Structure formats: C-alpha cells, structure tokens
Amino acid sequence: LALFLGLVFSFYSISAFAQIRDAEIAKDDQNGQWLSYGRTHNETRFAPFEDINDSNVQELGVEWYIDLPNDVGLVSTPLVVDGILYFVGTMNIVRAVDAVSGEILWTYNPRVAEEIAGKKKVGWVHNRGLTFYGDKVYGATWDGRLFALNHKTGEEAWITRTFSIDTPLYITGTPKAFKGKVVIGNGGTENGPTRGFITAYDAETGEEAWKFYIVPGNPADGFENAAMEMAAETWTGDWWKNGGGGNAWHGFTYDAEMDALYIGTGNGAPWNASIRSPDGGDNLFLSSVLALDPDTGEYLWHYQTTPGETWDYNSNMDIVLTDLEIAGSTVKALLHAPKNGFFYVLNRENGELISAEKYAEANWASHIDMATGRPVENQGARFNNNTKITPGPLGAHSWHPMSYNPSTGLVYIPTIHWGVQYNDEGYDGEFTSNDFEPNLAVDWTEDLDYEISGSLQAWDPVGQRQIWEVGYDHMYNAGTLTTAGNLVFQGTAEGSLMAYDASNGQTLWKKDLGLGISAPPISYKIDNQQYLSILVGWGGGGAAGLDRDGSTLGWAYGRHTRRLITFSLGGDNEIPSQPAPSFPEPLVDTGFQIDPNLAILGETAFANNFCGGCHGTAAIPAGMAPDLRASPILLDQQAFYSIVRDGALVSRAMPSHPDITDDELESIRHYIRQQAINAQRQ
C-alpha cells in the first residue's frame, strides 16, 4: 500500500508540472520564470517586470545567498522554472535551488575531473549555462558529454558523448533546446586541427538527429552536402590538414517565426589565413551567421561578417531577434555584435544585410560596403610589419551577453577597448598538442600604446549610433539584463553590481559584492515578488590571465568566496565581507639556483602546455588558478612533478599532463622561479 501511495503521489506531483515547450519559452511573461539562456527564444534578456524600477531600485537588498567555496570561475546564466533555480558551476556541477529560500535541493556532479584525467591538458572550469525543455534540465561538460537530468531529482535521464575525448575539442557553451531537439557545438579552434560542427539530439532519448559541419573537409572524401561543396570553393591549399576551425562554441538562437536555427560560427584554424588558405578566399563558413533548418540541419542562408578571417574575429556572440521599424516598414531583424567591432542588423527572413556600423574602435576595416555586404579592409591589416590592430583577438564584444529593451529600443553591449600587435614572424604551422596554439605571433605580454578599458554602451540598432556609454577601467565586464522597470543591470570586473537608467545611463544603484563578476544577472517573479539573481565568481578569459588587465585586479586565487546572491526590494540579509584585493608575494629562495638557459626553454614549455591558460600568460595570474611565482610547490621537484604530470590535484581542476617530459618539467620550474625574481624586482 505504501508503495502504491508513493507511486500515486509521484504521478500527481509530476503531472502537476506543466512541461516547458517552445510556446512557453516564446512567451514574454513566462509566468515570471526565466526559461532559457536569453530568457526567450529571441535571446533579448529582457525581463518584462516593473516591480523593481528606476524609482525604487535603491531599495534592493539581499534576500538570500549561497556560498560556493569549491567553485572557481562562475560565468553561467541561471534558469528559474516552477519555483526552482538551476545553475551550473565549476567543473560542470549542476545545482537546483529553491528560488525563494535559497535552499539547495539537489546537486549533480558529472565528474569531469575523473573523465579528463590523463586525456585532456587544458582544464577549463567554466560553463555558460543550462537549458530546460519538457521536464528535463540539459547541460554539457567540458570533455564533450551532453546530459539530460530529471528536473525534480537531478538524476540522469540520459548522457551521450558528442565527440571523442581524444580530440582537441571542448564545450563551454549552453545547449539550445527547441522542437523536441537539443543542439550543442564545441570549441577548440586554437587547440589543434579542428573542423567545427554542431549536432542536434532527440531531447527525450539523446539519439543523434543531425550534424552540420561548419567548414569543408578533404575533397577527396566527398562533401556531406551541397553547402560544403559550395564552401570548399572559398578555400585554397590543403586547408583540411589543419581542420579549418569555425567551431560554434556559443551563439545559438531559434527563430520560431521563421522556423530557423541561427548559429554564430567561429574563427579559422590556424588564425593566420595566409597559412590556412594560402591563395586567399573567404573561407566559408568562418565568422558567419548561419541559418539552418531546425528539423534537418540543412543549410538555409548565411552572412559572413569577416571574410577570410585572420584576427580571431569569430561571430560566436549572442544573436538577438526583434522587430524593428525601419524607413516606415516593420523588419524581422537579427541583431549581432561580433568581435570585429561592427554592429550588424540583418533581415532574418533571408539573411540580407540591412545596416552595419562600428560600435567600437576597429582599424582593420574602414566600413562595410552596403552594395556587397563586405568589409573594406585597411591597408596593412593582415599582419604586415607588426601592425597594431583594433580590436584585439578578445574582440570588441566577447561572449558576455548583450540585451535588448523593446521599450527603449536600445541594445546594451558590454564593450571591450583594446588592440594588439599582429605579425607572422616565426610562425609554426604545425599543431603539436591539444593545447592552446594560436599559431601566429601575437605577443600577449607586450605593452602597447592602446589603453585597455571597457564600457557599457546603449546602442540604437535603427539609427546605428551610440545613445549613451558608461566607461570602466577594466575590459572584461559581465553581460547585461534589462527590464520593463527602465533598468539595465551589469556586474563589473571590479566587483560591483550596477543598475543604470535604461534611457540615459544614469547610475541608480551600486552594490559592492567583493569579487569580480563575470556572469550576467537574471530576474524572475514568484508570488508577486520580483527577484534579481547573479553568480559572483570572477571567471572567463580575464580570470585566466590571457591578458595583463585581469592580473591587475587583485582577485587572488583561493582568497575570495564565490556566491550565488539573490536580491529583492526590502531584502534585509547581509553577505559576509570579502577580503580586500591582494597580490601574492613572489617567493624567492636563494637556495634555488636558476639556470638561465633552462628558464628560456621553460618559457616555451609553459606556453606549449598552455599553463598560461589558467596560471596566466608569462605566469602572471588573474585569479583562476594559484600564482605559481608564490608557490612553495615549485621548490619541491617531486611534488611539482606529481601535480603536473601525475594529476595529484585533478579533483581541484588541475589537469594532468602524462606526456610531459622531465626536461620540460624542470625547465618550467626554472622559468617560473625566474619570473618570481623578475616580479620582485619590479
């Protein structure tokens, strides 16, 4: 009888839950929920709630918070479905939380550390989010698995591998669910000879439905479809030997009106187009907005933002859909602000360019020719004479999502202001490992004349002009949320959650959260109460130390607690204070005799094994991993070898490098010790 009653209760509990399908995701109100990465299929990140508004936002207080002491970089967008908040943290661990009280209901650990042990060298700890469809939560792991979870219990409904773990590919992106399917892509363009693709799976069973490759393969093997045959005409040389790239690691939008799936595609592999495709060519479908049939994966149309891409100007940024009034007509518009510094408005019915203007510094091209839809490149932009180019490879806008407010008609873009020096001297055209290899000489450590900064700008997509801008001292600030309360929310690299007047950019509220913020906020309503939630945990490329900017913030590894924080009007809880920003003191041991020749070799070994991907370029970290210059582990040869080669700290997201040699390990030790001395001298 007890078993029978339990089954009956379970049946009625599950039946009471209204499954989430495309119609629910498409609704503006969504009954107060946040059902998808960009809230609706249109990816606007607009919350149509006005309880919290420009007249009372200063009354926001902490409703509840959760400490996440074992997490590192937090960059994901939470979901809120039926009163439960779902989010993904470090190493793809998923948690379900009561969205009103903050109580953790269940945790799912896909055990990424164990999966990648001895197989993957680059230990990314980030993921940008989950998706919800039907009655399941979907996520993906860095090592390439796609999973579906029971939304009530967190138990696996199914899990499947989307690529071999032995390839250079990885996943940091959010799956996209629509029409009974779940789509996922992958990254890895810089990690080896990759040929990007996206795959759709049956949402109920996990069975593969279709796959679309983004660049053509070896013509001798035949082409998968007519689109690949067409694309191959735009490549030269033996491009397939280096893969070609194009990886779709982010930027999926489903258009229910057009019944189309839009994919933002990646940059070339290797970066340098003169090596990748020596006799020129546009190299389709790199750096493009690609429209596919959502049922079959068949090609519909494309628009390429950067033909013959060579600067890491991918188009993986979010794709936003809306209707715009242009010249007296309603246009079904697609809005896109990729890395290359131009803001594009496309007609999503056919992919035709409506307008394009610079939204940031971009000296690689003068303008977009409206007759051809192509950029007009400036002389010397393609690595000539160590040219300094804007934007740099991190782009004028990265993955940090922009938002669109239909009331103001404005797009709110987290913008990066930065340039680097490109050249192709000393280029090595061979990928040597599954580690990060841009394969062109971009000196990330060189001090350039360009200032590094960031900004939030409000952009008019109809007039193609900036309406207002707020400047920041640092470039890697978080994605945005805009609301019907005439507000724009954004977290900053310096650790503040900001609320701005959506119309004029006036600062209305500021809350110091004690740690750099990389994740975008969300808003939801339960029982007529509006909430604002955000993950606080400095992450992404800024925290990895890929550039010098992040290392100046003082978010030292292990000192600052990561958190999920939820606010409400009149919230009266207090979050514990965080330590002040700090910079670990480099450890100098006079008993360690540095061999200068080994240190020189160690610089190369440090780069080739992508140690800098977590510990910072030139061993100058930015918070995602310990400062090795201050670590006593470097003084203990056996302990250092055990961690780096044998994986003694795999459970803490430090990957093992089983193939690294004693000579490489020793040279890295000497290089880091040399960097410690150099830091002390400064």
Per-segment meaning from a language model:
Residues I184-G196, T236, I263-N283, H417-D449, ...:
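Short, conserved, GDST-rich strand-edge loop motifs in beta-rich repeat architectures
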Residues W34-G38, D71-I93, K119-L146, Y170-N191, ...:
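Repeat-blade elements of multi-bladed beta-propeller folds
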Residues I522-S582:
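Blade-level signature of beta-propeller repeat domains, shared across WD40, Kelch, NHL, RCC1
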Residues I20-V62, N218-M228, R374-E377, T445, ...:
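Blade/loop signatures of beta-propeller domains
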Residues I594-T617, S642-D646:
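Sequence/structural segment immediately N-terminal to covalent heme-attachment motifs in c-type
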Residues I66-T77, T107-T131, E156-T174, Y213-G251, ...:
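Extracytoplasmic beta-rich repeat domains
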Residues A140, H151, L598, H657-Q682:
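C-terminal capping alpha-helices of c-type cytochrome domains
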Residues G616-L649, A653-S656:
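Gly/Gly-Pro-rich "capping" loops immediately C-terminal to redox-active cysteine motifs
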